[in-house]
């Protein structure tokens, strides 16, 4: 039988919440007897928006806003059925986007 792998990709704007969520997932998977690889920090995505400060003229006066998206990757190698059940029941904070691939 081939090795089964679950790949979990986490995204959030707040890196503290993201790290707490990753720690919860790693702790849960280790407790159920699965092998873990990660959390691996992926490059932070920066989106910059430039807007005019004035509504009418003065084009030289602009303001920039930045939005950062932090990402982490966790691989669970050889997960047990108990691992999958405990990950489904795991309560993670809002603001964290989770993608799971089998």
UniProtKB/Swiss-Prot annotation:
It comes from Lactiplantibacillus plantarum (strain ATCC BAA-793 / NCIMB 8826 / WCFS1). HAMAP family: Ribosomal_uS10 (MF_00508). Part of the 30S ribosomal subunit. InterPro entries: Ribosomal_uS10, Ribosomal_uS10_CS, Ribosomal_uS10_dom, Ribosomal_uS10_dom_sf. This is Small ribosomal subunit protein uS10. Belongs to the universal ribosomal protein uS10 family. Keywords: Ribonucleoprotein, Ribosomal protein. PROSITE patterns: RIBOSOMAL_S10. NCBIfam families: PRK00596.1, rpsJ_bact. GO terms for molecular function: structural constituent of ribosome; tRNA binding.
């Amino acid at each position: 039988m081939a090795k089964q792998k679950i790949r979990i990709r986490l995204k959030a704007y707040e890196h503290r919440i993201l790290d707490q969520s990753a720690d919860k997932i790693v702790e849960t998977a280790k407790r159920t007897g699965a092998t873990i690889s990660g959390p691996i920090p992926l490059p932070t995505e920066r989106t910059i928006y430039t807007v005019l400060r004035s509504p009418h003229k003065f084009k030289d006066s602009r303001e920039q806003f930045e939005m950062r998206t932090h990402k982490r990757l966790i691989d669970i190698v050889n997960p047990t059925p108990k691992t999958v059940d405990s990950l489904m029941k795991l309560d993670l904070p809002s603001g964290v986007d989770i993608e799971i691939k089998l």
